[in-house]
Amino acid sequence: MKFIQIMEFTGSAEEAINSINNYIDIAGEETKVKKATVCEDRDTPGRLLQVIEFDSYEDAMINNDLEVTKKASEEDTSSFGDVEFKNLNVVEVFEM
């Protein structure tokens, strides 16, 4: 079952994009992330959401245990403050 992790925090879209690009450069093929999307709340400027997609919950947990992910998480906390996580099992996807 596919799994999505939503990260919600305050910062700039540019900083969030740079953070993901740095993670991609460092993690390379080690990461289990399949897709990452950065979104900015139109109604609350500076409020960001990152939608991180995995093939499964198990892959997400493996990814969370990687040293590169732990380091990136520490850097994100120092850059963006508290990050709120939502952990979602994908039940169905509809392509329109």
Segments (PLM) and residue ranges:
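Short S/T/G/P-rich N-terminal loop/turn motif that feeds into the first structured element of a domain
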Residues: 1-68, 79-96
